[in-house]
């Protein structure tokens, strides 16, 4: 007797959930709505200048997606990921061997300067030591383990036709011990 009364009381307190979450009328309206054409998004192979790295932006009153809002290097990275290309080549360097002067570990770079972090050979045998390689000085040796890294420049070739020396800042790289070693010792 007591059990049947509590079951009836609980049933009265429970709210009935609607069978449909939204009305059918709004669903029909959404299905019949015209879709706006998506603005043309340039493919990675179509990007030639910095101006190609500006997105269309969002329509007024809407929240932009990452693709619509991104510009510059961020947009280049997103477009590359959409096509399955790792634009910045974030793979770790070859740690299966020790780099030597005859067979250095290759580091690709699209800029004039590239940093590489050496963790030693075998891997993680010492703390990270950051080495700086430039186009003028593409080979660097780790002072801790002796690993040798070489920068392979893959960026655009220099065009000196319109260069009048305005960018030259007069900085000379400081000399190191390697500058004083005789060539026959290399």
Curated annotation (Swiss-Prot):
**Which residues participate in Zn(2+) binding?**
118, 126, 142, 145
Q: Which GO terms describe its cellular component?
A: mitochondrial inner membrane; respiratory chain complex IV
| Subunit-level organization | Component of the cytochrome c oxidase (complex IV, CIV), a multisubunit enzyme composed of 11 subunits. The complex is composed of a catalytic core of 3 subunits Cox1, Cox2 and Cox3, encoded in the mitochondrial DNA, and 8 supernumerary subunits Cox4, Cox5a/Cox5, Cox6, Cox7, Cox8, Cox7a/Cox9, Cox6b/Cox12 and Cox6a/Cox13, which are encoded in the nuclear genome.
- Span of chain positions assigned to the transit peptide in the UniProt entry: 1-31
Q: Which gene does this sequence derive from?
A: cox-4
Report the locations given in the UniProt record.
Mitochondrion inner membrane
Q: What name appears for this protein in its UniProt entry?
A: Cytochrome c oxidase subunit 4, mitochondrial
The biological processes this protein is annotated with in GO are: mitochondrial cytochrome c oxidase assembly; mitochondrial electron transport, cytochrome c to oxygen
Q: Name one GO molecular function term.
A: zinc ion binding
């Amino acid at each position: 007797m007591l059990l049947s009364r509590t079951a009836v009381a609980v049933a009265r307190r429970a709210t009935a959930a609607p069978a449909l979450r939204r009305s059918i009328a709004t669903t029909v309206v959404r299905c019949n709505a015209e879709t706006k054409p998506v603005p043309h998004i340039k493919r990675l192979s179509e990007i030639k200048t910095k101006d190609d790295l500006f997105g269309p932006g969002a329509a007024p009153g809407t929240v932009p997606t990452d693709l619509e809002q991104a510009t510059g290097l961020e947009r280049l990275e997103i477009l590359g990921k959409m096509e399955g290309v790792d634009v910045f080549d974030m793979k770790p360097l070859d740690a299966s061997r020790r780099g030597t002067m005859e067979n250095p570990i290759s580091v690709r770079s699209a800029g004039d300067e590239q940093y590489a972090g050496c963790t030693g050979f075998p891997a993680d045998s010492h703390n990270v030591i950051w080495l700086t390689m430039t186009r003028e000085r593409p080979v660097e040796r780790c002072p801790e383990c002796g690993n040798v890294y070489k920068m392979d420049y893959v960026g655009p070739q220099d065009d000196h036709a319109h260069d009048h020396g305005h960018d030259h800042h007069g900085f000379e790289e400081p000399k190191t011990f390697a500058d004083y070693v005789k060539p026959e010792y290399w």
